[in-house]
């Protein structure tokens, strides 16, 4: 009887210890993605130019090009400031695309062109150019969109990374699962993200590169996107002219883009 009680106490202690470790690891995972989110996007409204180049297999020069002028209201609650996740992507190049606009309001995405009477809903997975989908040009808040689990450490080039498994919190989130690699040291800068389908097939990989001091923090100014099913073809997103901006909330509405986004 005494041995049985001791065994039960030992088993209970082990389960408690494992549970405490799991909770601690999950808390760390949330902290890591929060810090990486802060690297990818400041917690203030900002604006930037996004240039996308598509490279075919074996090509040294881009086959296609798209330029967007993007305004972001992507903020987490802080003091009296409420959470927000809206963006406005204006098409600049090629010239035939001028006047087209993508409006993102949390998980809703709308497309407008002067030929249409009103904005129409579109999918974030819909292809925009090359390996880039509509959702790729808009910053994703991983902390809000995914539950995170710390899976361990792996080498990332010349540094060491934490590997995080992200599982979406709702069906509204575009990708069901993401393997997310963030640097172990410093600000937990994002290194790579691998996106998976519902049946756990790799769809694409995203590499964060060319970190520069922008808006008070080292941020990736280049993102390389590779799709698993397109061989060695890839697309490159380059960020420039990044600055703070204070567009009114009213600018991020379907009515506003019909009148002409500024």
Model features per residue range: what roles?
Residues 36-37, 69-78, 208-213:
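Extended lipid/amphipathic-ligand handling interfaces
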Residues 37-46, 80-82, 213-217:
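Edge/loop elements at the starts and ends of beta-strands within beta-rich repeat scaffolds
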Residues 23-45, 52, 60-64, 95-176, ...:
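Flexible, processing/modification-adjacent segments and terminal tails
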